[in-house]
Every structure is written in C-alpha cells, then in structure tokens.
C-alpha cells in the first residue's frame, strides 16, 4: 500500500481489450505495491460517447472524453497511456511528449519505421526535460520471465547458442471470422507478426541481452477475404447483425442466410523466420493466428553450453531448467515454481505456491513505470527498445517479400542518432 502523497494523474486513450487490462493495473497497483507516487485514474478517452462513458464507470475512471487532444493538453494529466490501434500511436505519443507528459504506449510501438523513429527520437529529447516513456511489452513483467533473464545474466546457461520462440493462437481459423481492424494493414501495421510476433522478438532480446542482427522469413495469409463487420471494438465485431465476441469465431452470415459484403485481408496470418543474434546465436521464430487449438501459446527456450531454460505462458508461474553441470546420474529438467518471495515481484503478492495470472503482468508494468517516473529513472523497455523490435518486424517483412532473402537488421541507436 502506497504511503506517499504524490499523485500521478493518468489519462488513457482506448478502452477495449488493452484498455481494460491497463485499467486493472492502474486500479490495483498502489493497493499492492508501496510506491513513491500514487496513480489516479483521471480521464479515459474513446471515440464513442456512450461506450467511453460506460467504460469509465465500469473500469474506474473519474471522467471521460471523446477528444484525445483535450486529454493530452490538459494541465490535470501527468501520464498519457496509449491503448489504441497502431495507426494512432505515433500521433498521440508525439503530442503527449511535446506537451511534457510521461507516456506509456502499447506495443508494437508504431505501424511504420518512420513513425517509430520519430517516437524514439522524441522520447530521447524529452528525457532531458525529465519526461519518461515506456513501450508496453507486458510479458517482461511475468516473474518467471524476469527470473529467466537473471539465470542467463548469471551465467547459469553458459555460452548461449540457440533460441527458439513461438507464439500461437487460433482465433481467426474460421474463414467467416470478420475483417476486424487487426486484419487491416492501415490500422494494425502487420498481422500475427506485429501483434504477437513482436512479443517473442522483444522477449528473446530481453532475456538474452542480445540483438537480432539478421533474418530470413516467410509469411502467409491463409484466408485472403473476409466478411466486413458493421462495427468493431477491441476483439469483438458485429457482422450482418450477429456479434462475434472475444477471441472466438462465429458464423458471420445473417439470419436470412445471405453472405455479407467482404473485404481483403491485408496482413499476414502467420510468420516464420530464422535469425542471428549478436555473438552468432542461432534463433527460430514462429507467430501464427492459425494454430488450431492453440489459444494463447507463447513459448521461449534458450539453449546454452551449460544448460537450458524454458518458459511457457500456459504455465506462467513455472520455469523448466536443465543444469548440465550436475552429475550425469542427476541430470534432467527440473521445474521451478516462481512464487517465492525472493522471486521478482512476488513478495507483494501471496504466500509461496499461490499463483498469479496474465493480468498481474500489467500491474507489474504499472509498478515499474510509476517508480521510474517518480524517481527520475528512464523505464524499460524504452521507445528505443520499441524501435529495435520495429526494425526486426520491418526486416522480416522485407525478407518475406524478397523470397526469404537474408536481411540485416540495423541497430536502433544508430537509427535514432541518424
């Protein structure tokens, strides 16, 4: 429980899936962690007056607006939290930084390299004035992932040789699932690659401390045309009078059996690529929304000369660890239950053995952001880190377009400096 009187007034743009996740975090964080400042959920913004008013009451915000520029310009806002589709990230974040607001922006940082470069450069400039920014890769805040990184940093795996990462979902397997914004390049930037592939790109670079330097990729769009929704919000849509809600597909035909108008899918459904990381590390990545039966299956495995560590999101309170330095008769994968008070973040929660879930990663993200802003430290992942992921996404896209040709990934710091 926070004992400080300092207040950080948060304004959030967007109220759907990520907006709800972030709201839960802002609402909870000071009730769990003792921090040098308190978050106040001051203002939420959305395009639809009735829906944003409902979200404000349901999620716990003091007030609501339909004008994000009003939110950014307000003297009563200290932090701007961007939870919108990728096509508006740059405009909102750049305006917020220019107004002297601290910014938390959902991943991927932007839809294009040029937008991401501008955001990273603006964030670096704003640092001199004490304005902080963070890109929202929430899986870094899973305690088991943070411990995984510590095992690598402590040398428990020896020389890192091989990385393999997958993120698999199946929510658009049905060809009648509607053409929601996540399936349109102008709104989302890319498909499975940017939506979920960005997570495993960031996680592997974070855990190993090594940058992806080159890639060879293939991408595929399995269903190229889909029914047009009458409207959509977050992960829900209305098609010809029928609501398709959450991450499930449903028959999009109307009650009278006719087929609604259709539109073209302009993003990838799946992306697979091999990569090199600094130091010659070999890596493989797969991101797919067509892995039938896989609802939200993220898995990262790191192989080294002295051992292996594995994280599986479906068992997010655990790590698998293989220690090759143990006597041959004792070797084998062991399970580490990451619920001890000594484990990252866990001392604020429950007694050992009592597990946490997906939503806690957002609470931990809010904790780290508040602490960084209140103590004058630059939080991570920074917008430069977000740009580095964007550069990998761009290289993967270009490689796939060029028949899987080997494509180098430039360093983000060089890009920002340029």
Question: What do the predicted segments below correspond to?
Answer:
Residues 1-59:
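N-terminal Rossmann-like dinucleotide-binding module
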Residues 1-4, 29, 79-81, 124, ...:
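C-terminal helix-rich "cap/oligomerization" subdomain common to oxidoreductases
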Residues 62-67:
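Conserved SAM-binding strand-loop segment of SAM-dependent methyltransferases
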Residues 79, 85-140, 155:
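Beta-strand-loop-alpha-helix segment that lines the small-molecule cofactor/substrate pocket
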Residues 100, 130, 155, 280, ...:
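Glycine-centered short loops/turns at secondary-structure junctions
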Residues 129-131, 139-265, 319, 403:
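Predominantly a Rossmann-like dinucleotide-binding segment in NAD(P)-dependent oxidoreductases
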Residues 198, 286-295, 354:
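Glycine-rich phosphate/pyrophosphate-binding beta-alpha loops
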Residues 224-268, 272, 276-279, 306-380, ...:
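C-terminal glycine/acidic-rich active-site capping loop/insertion
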């Amino acid at each position: 429980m926070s004992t400080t009187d300092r207040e950080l007034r948060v304004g959030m743009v967007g109220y759907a899936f990520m907006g709800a996740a972030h709201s839960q975090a802002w609402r909870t964080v000071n009730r769990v962690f003792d921090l040098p400042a308190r978050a106040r959920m001051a203002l939420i913004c959305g395009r639809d007056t009735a829906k944003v008013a409902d979200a404000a009451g349901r999620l716990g915000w003091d007030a609501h607006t339909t004008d994000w520029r009003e939110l950014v310009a307000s003297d009563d806002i200290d932090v701007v939290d961007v939870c919108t589709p990728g096509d508006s990230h740059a405009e909102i974040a750049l305006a917020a930084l220019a107004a002297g607001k601290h910014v938390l922006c959902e991943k991927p940082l932007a839809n294009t390299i040029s937008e991401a470069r501008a955001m990273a450069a603006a964030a670096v400039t704003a640092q001199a004035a004490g304005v902080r920014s963070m890109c929202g890769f929430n899986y870094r805040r899973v305690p088991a992932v943070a411990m995984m990184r510590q095992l690598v940093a402590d040398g428990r795996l020896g020389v890192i040789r091989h990385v393999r990462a997958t993120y698999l979902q199946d929510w658009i397997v049905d060809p009648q699932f509607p053409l929601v914004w996540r399936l349109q390049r102008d709104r989302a930037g890319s498909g499975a690659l940017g939506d979920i592939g960005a997570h495993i790109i960031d996680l592997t670079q974070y855990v190993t401390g090594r940058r992806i330097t080159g890639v060879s990729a293939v991408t595929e769009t399995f269903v190229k045309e889909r029914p047009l929704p009458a409207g959509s919000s977050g992960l829900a849509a209305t098609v010809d009078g029928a609501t398709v809600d959450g991450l499930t597909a449903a028959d999009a035909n109307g009650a009278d059996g006719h087929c609604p108008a259709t539109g073209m899918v302009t993003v990838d459904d799946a992306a697979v690529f091999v990569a090199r990381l600094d130091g010659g590390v070999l890596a493989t990545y797969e991101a797919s929304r067509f892995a039938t039966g896989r609802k939200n299956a993220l898995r990262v495995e790191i192989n080294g000369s002295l051992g292996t560590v594995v994280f599986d999101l479906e068992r997010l309170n655990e790590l698998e660890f293989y220690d090759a330095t143990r006597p041959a008769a004792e070797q084998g994968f062991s399970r580490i239950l990451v619920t001890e008070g000594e484990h990252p973040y866990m001392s604020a929660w429950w007694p050992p053995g009592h597990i946490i879930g997906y939503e806690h990663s957002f609470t931990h993200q809010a904790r780290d952001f508040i602490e960084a802003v209140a103590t004058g430290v630059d939080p991570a992942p920074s917008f430069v880190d977000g740009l580095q992921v964007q550069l990998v996404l761009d290289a993967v896209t270009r490689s796939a377009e060029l028949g899987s040709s080997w494509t180098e990934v430039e360093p983000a710091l060089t890009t920002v400096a340029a």
